[in-house]
Amino acid sequence: IEKQAREFKPQFVSVSDENDAKKLRTSLADTDIEVGYGMDGLIRCATIEPCDIVVTAIVGMLGIRPTIAAIKAKKTIALANKETLVTAGHIIIPLAKEYGVSILPVDSEHSAIFQSLQGNSMNPIKKILLTASGGPFRGRKLSELEGIRVEDALKHPNWSMGQKITIDSSTMVNKGLEVIEAKWLFDVDLSQIHVVVHPQSVIHSAVEYADGAVIAQLGTPDRRIPIQYALYYPSRPALSGDRLDLFKLKDLTFEAPDLDTFKGLALAMKAARAGGNIPTAFNAANERAVALFLNKKIKYLEIIDIIEACMENASFIENPSVDEILDTERCAYDYISK
């Protein structure tokens, strides 16, 4: 982080740990860069005065409070943190409307939906077609997932991503989180969101309108495109890289998700229908279970067993506050540790 700070010369840098902050301050003593840490540091980053757009890309529910602070400071939000809307969408979306703040999606699928909505804001959405690659185990049955190793689950066929999201993609939990995120971002009912398995990852998602027209966003699987679109919206600066060549496309195929095998998606839909703090229990259980799997403490299929058990164990809260959301997370962690 010292190298990045020296290269980009930000006004402020924050780290998670106080001791790390002290070391970084010493390392950057010959610069004018301020160093903070912890939640206070995150909130300072999210609200600092020269900033006009905040990219929220923190993994997990740590992103909730800084995002709320950024909205209250009237910063445009480029959202890459699914958990913020999955667990606190009922807080974030009304708050953004109250402060007149735009939330621009960074995830490729939600960016595709957002792009497909441009110029059509007055036309009613019939359905959102949320595409999924299907992950490395597409086409397998549940019995074939016994004995899956960490290295097997980390081999995504199309995208290069971090470990946690790659595991989430393999279980289709990630797509479940994206369904909940789409519900909040685009103000639609769950019944209007349809997951479509599209192994080639060329169509990144689509919107069907009431007149039968379907508008989709296509492109190569390049994460830089949706990131740049959020940062420069509504402009589209030139971007180097591979281009989509329609003449080289052999097939574009589509299939329904197998909810019997990939129960993570089914459980996410169940959590979304339940509402309240149940999506938080779902998300927290998945975070901890994936960490256990990556550390080879549990088997692959136990990820879903843990999620289901935590959802059943959660005490329902219809309209949870941020503190209650975080308490639900702690309760899920405690339940798993037992």
Residue ranges and their predicted role:
Residues 1-338:
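Catalytic, metal-anchored helix/loop core of enzyme active sites in primary metabolism
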